[in-house]
């Protein structure tokens, strides 16, 4: 017998049979070795063939093991194994069967048929397991589908549809697909295209996450329920698994053979199968190698002849990039656009999916949570599409509640830790012999007893609440299964079964659910089982960093006293503080315009009056860290070409992939304070970019992505008009301030374009600082020095005269508060540093600072 006349799978089986014989110390390869290997062969056709023929495979496997155990063993030396006479006889019989059926190569199924006819022990075992020759022959005919074995790899190409596709209609029948709500127009349009005589291959095109795959699943459900035209009623909808098709294709031509097998199977089905190719663009170039043909080109003839009835799905970008370039492939498909659903449609979709998700997580999802998921995701998650992002929100919020139910409640956990701590102390005290320790042990035992009782009671409550929840979940699962059984009975027209489920099983289960729900009516103390709008808002906050959850009392008070908090750090600029505080409060209460930034301001004033300091104080107030502020020094953008740094380089330029400085920062942190410092120093083209940010709250970066600025506060600072401010300073009356503001606005209007000024929420002119305010600022700045000294365990105590001296030295109406910082450095910090180095002050000392002869003097208290 020639080995090269066996199919590759049969050759592999023979090699594995030899290994099996060697491993079991057998000197001869018997038919049982080969049959045993064929039965366990990965991807082989022997096991499916026997199952199809009604053979009891587990019983057969036991009998084969018994036969293998009974074979004689040779140990102690390595011997060559050779085929037995019985195996050779069976191979001759297999060869004869193959030739009778017109095969060029011997396939494994003829070996199975030869064994059934055999009178040996293996044949008897097979017949004892229920094998009959006629049934085996019928199963072989079905497996081969009228084809002969003409190539070595013929066995691998068999049942290609079962191997490389997923049956969506079968999944719909078993209730494994999520319900598809709405999308009637798109499904109708898809059916319309499928019903055409030619070009009957729709391709669904839309943004990621709008529900392209869901439309195909909806079509599968309609086919199963018979809610489609007559022409589609008996068809199967299969999804091509491209990963399985490519996986393990090691040699050139192997992938093409597999795809050809799929196409041949489809041709044999004569239009009874619709093939769904998700991510259609992956077919263009798949399997492409030097001199080879890619999958896209292999599909074209089948599509043109009408042998392949296909639905594709891909995104707009991928369609343009891959499919449109191949005009011959594109013309064989008919485009069906899938748009993003509205918020109202998304709410309807979520209501339809609610039961599935509630059942999966074992929690209750309330309707306000569904509405919140749709509205909040639409407003705050801008880089993804509905309904995908809303479904993800609902899913994650339900997952969070489930996690809290499964994990130990915080109160119980705290009690348990306290108990462990006390028990450790008890063990330590048991070793002590003195009376005081014995008394403490008695007290400790009493405390442990009280805590133990409290812990046991709480744990019992927690377990009973969990059990109540799980009981209701089990009933809901039974109701879901009963509904699936009812649908299956309806399709089979089994009216007796339908009547039994509809009027017997379902009402009984619903009565049980009502009883379980009434038992749950009491408020759960430790377990929360409902997903509310608040949980959805918390998930949005975690995703985006935007605080959309309900404000706690502490935060409300904090926002109401915002002016006072900012005023403690920024002195003498009450108007600016009020304007900024109002913008933050509007944003936090949801009253600000949803299509514009939370606030956009231009701060004007001379140097050193607190423009940048107010932004730092605001960042610390909002985010507990002044590092959360996005600060851009506009003096870096003085050249025309430097504008590209803000939004990213255009295509074809170096740095295109990196994105823009401003846009990337805001994409990562959408809720932030953006400070554009010294804005008048930037090139005029920068303001053209800022126009759409200030008006629509959005900016398109170099890669075409839209970046959302609607949750940012934009502050620009400028020194324009500082000369006019200095000239009119010295009088704090409202009339003078109005006159000063008008003079400054004249300068501003001369420098900035009207369309830029018109888009700002407010232009704030900062007041010059007087001596009293400089003294206040000195106190604030000295607090920083006190903190630094505290690290060295030193305290600082300045009397009023010393503070007065620093205020006088640091006061300069032209330069604001910056000279004060220099005065503190030169008058106080330099001298104090020398004193500390000289050993005048050591850890634990208090440094008393006074004035003597117009100079600061230091003494130890």
Curated annotation (Swiss-Prot):
Family recorded in the similarity comment: Belongs to the ClpA/ClpB family.
Region (Repeat 2): 83-146
Region of interest: C-terminal: 769-861
Localization: Cytoplasm
GO CC, any one term: cytoplasm
A single BP term in Gene Ontology: protein refolding
Entry protein name: Chaperone protein ClpB
Protein's UniProt keywords contain Nucleotide-binding: yes
Clp R domain segment(s): 3-146
Region of interest: Linker: 341-545
Entry remark concerning the domains of this protein: The Clp repeat (R) domain probably functions as a substrate-discriminating domain, recruiting aggregated proteins to the ClpB hexamer and/or stabilizing bound proteins. The NBD2 domain is responsible for oligomerization, whereas the NBD1 domain stabilizes the hexamer probably in an ATP-dependent manner. The movement of the coiled-coil domain is essential for ClpB ability to rescue proteins from an aggregated state, probably by pulling apart large aggregated proteins, which are bound between the coiled-coils motifs of adjacent ClpB subunits in the functional hexamer.
Taxonomic lineage of the native organism: Bacteria, Pseudomonadati, Pseudomonadota, Gammaproteobacteria, Lysobacterales
Keywords annotated in UniProt: ATP-binding, Chaperone, Coiled coil, Cytoplasm, Nucleotide-binding, Repeat, Stress response
Role: Part of a stress-induced multi-chaperone system, it is involved in the recovery of the cell from heat-induced damage, in cooperation with DnaK, DnaJ and GrpE. Acts before DnaK, in the processing of protein aggregates. Protein binding stimulates the ATPase activity; ATP hydrolysis unfolds the denatured protein aggregates, which probably helps expose new hydrophobic binding sites on the surface of ClpB-bound aggregates, contributing to the solubilization and refolding of denatured protein aggregates by DnaK.
Binding residues annotated for ATP 1, in chain numbering: 206-213
Stretches for region NBD1: 159-340
InterPro entries, alphabetized: AAA+_ATPase, ATPase_AAA_core, Chaperonin_ClpB, Clp_ATPase_C, Clp_N_dom_sf, Clp_R_dom, ClpA/B, ClpA/B_CS1
Gene source species: Xylella fastidiosa (strain Temecula1 / ATCC 700964)
